[in-house]
């Protein structure tokens, strides 16, 4: 059931190929994302889902395989440990080694020339074949600009722009893309960069946004831009739009607002405030609409109830409210956006090993 290469998978891989990276702990949310793809799939297209993993249990593989009942949708599982060898990938904060697996996609899928990579913390609210059909000839990938990061560049965190330019070597930091949704030209990537080069870059240092930084460093703005509706970043803590993206240039803000009107993919990106823990999170209703049809519904509901009823869950909620509803707004008042003292404080905080704001 667990293959070491796409060649060993019992999938035709003849049309739309979708790749996830997932651990056992995240399987319930992968199930919801998978359900959203199934419910929006066109009858005249073929969809093959490949899950890159190192620890998904046989029981979970069986459950996910049974979930995919449609005749034109298939699912298979690839073992990443064989490709990693003795390399230990760095991780910090809410990021985990699984986030690096997309770097290995060109090697793990030698018989696939084009594939969509998706994070597991999202739902697809349109036919994903439309994204797959985007022409990436001559480019390594297609992606959306990262409205959150661009908003930080423009004032919310002015250490970000110099980091992207000086550490990543980006010609224009405003070209930074969000890597949770990618249309990857695997043939192009295989011809231009080796897996060893990707992994060497990823382990050189602790990159601020991990393999997303590595991809942006390698691509350096040379990618096909797709509309942000294909990777709508949910309004995290109901602060992302008003406190961060509001600092971005007008065209970025406008595209983000257009995406919010009718998102094709809703990405629940952020260290907290996920809909399976916070029912008042942005777009939580959309998540639960698909979760209702997941075989993991009871487990997801249980996690929500635990976060609302247990001492540990309530303590975590209180901590989150204090930080994001109290401390962060107060920080913005004491150290206004765009000021030198704000930049100095953030630089010191990051230098001490602090997580991204």
Specify the residue positions occupied by each region the protein language model found.
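A recurrent flexible, glycine/aromatic-enriched loop bordering the glycosyltransferase active site
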Residues: 169-181
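Short internal beta-strands
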Residues: 47-55, 143-145
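Active-site-proximal specificity loops/subdomain of glycosyltransferases
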Residues: 60-108
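Histidine-anchored nucleotide/phosphate-binding helix
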Residues: 27-42
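Short loop->beta transition adjacent to catalytic acidic/histidine clusters or analogous donor-positioning motifs
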Residues: 16, 41-50, 75
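A glycosyltransferase accessory/donor-loop signature
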Residues: 1-16, 22, 179, 184-357
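GT-A fold catalytic core of metal-dependent nucleotide-sugar glycosyltransferases
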Residues: 77-83, 99-155, 183-184, 190
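Surface-exposed acidic, glycine/proline-enriched linker/cap segments
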Residues: 86-91, 100, 151-170
């Amino acid at each position: 059931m667990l293959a070491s290469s796409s060649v060993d998978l019992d999938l035709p891989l003849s049309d739309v190929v979708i790749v996830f990276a997932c651990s056992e702990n995240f399987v319930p949310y992968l199930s919801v994302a998978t359900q959203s793809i199934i419910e929006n799939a066109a009858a005249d297209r073929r969809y093959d889902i490949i899950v890159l993993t190192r620890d998904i249990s046989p029981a979970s593989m069986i459950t996910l395989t049974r979930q995919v009942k449609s005749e034109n949708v298939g699912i298979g599982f690839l073992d990443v440990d064989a490709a990693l060898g003795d390399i230990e990938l760095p991780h910090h904060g809410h990021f985990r080694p699984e986030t690096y697996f997309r770097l290995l996609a060109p090697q793990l899928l030698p018989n696939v020339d084009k594939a969509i990579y998706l994070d597991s913390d999202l739902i697809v609210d349109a036919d994903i074949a439309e994204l797959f059909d985007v022409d990436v000839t001559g480019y390594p990938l297609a992606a959306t600009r990262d409205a959150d990061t661009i908003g930080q560049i423009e004032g919310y965190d002015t250490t970000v722009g110099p980091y992207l330019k000086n550490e990543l070597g980006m010609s224009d930091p405003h070209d930074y893309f969000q890597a949770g949704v990618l249309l990857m030209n695997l043939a192009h990537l295989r011809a231009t960069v080796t897996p060893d080069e990707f992994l060497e870059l990823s382990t050189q240092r602790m990159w601020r946004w991990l393999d997303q930084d590595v991809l942006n460093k390698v691509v350096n703005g040379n990618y096909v831009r797709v509309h942000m509706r294909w990777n709508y970043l949910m309004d995290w803590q109901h602060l992302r739009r008003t406190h961060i993206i509001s600092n971005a240039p007008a065209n970025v803000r406008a595209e983000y607002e257009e995406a919010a009107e009718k998102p094709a993919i809703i990405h629940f990106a952020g260290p907290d405030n996920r809909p399976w823990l916070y029912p008042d999170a942005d777009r939580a209703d959309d998540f639960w609409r698909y979760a209702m049809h997941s075989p993991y519904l009871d487990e997801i509901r249980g996690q929500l109830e635990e976060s609302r009823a247990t001492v540990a869950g309530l303590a975590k909620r209180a901590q989150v409210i204090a930080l994001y509803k109290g401390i962060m707004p107060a920080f913005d008042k004491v150290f206004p956006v765009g000021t030198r003292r704000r930049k100095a404080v953030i630089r010191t905080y990051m230098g001490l090993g602090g997580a991204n704001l």
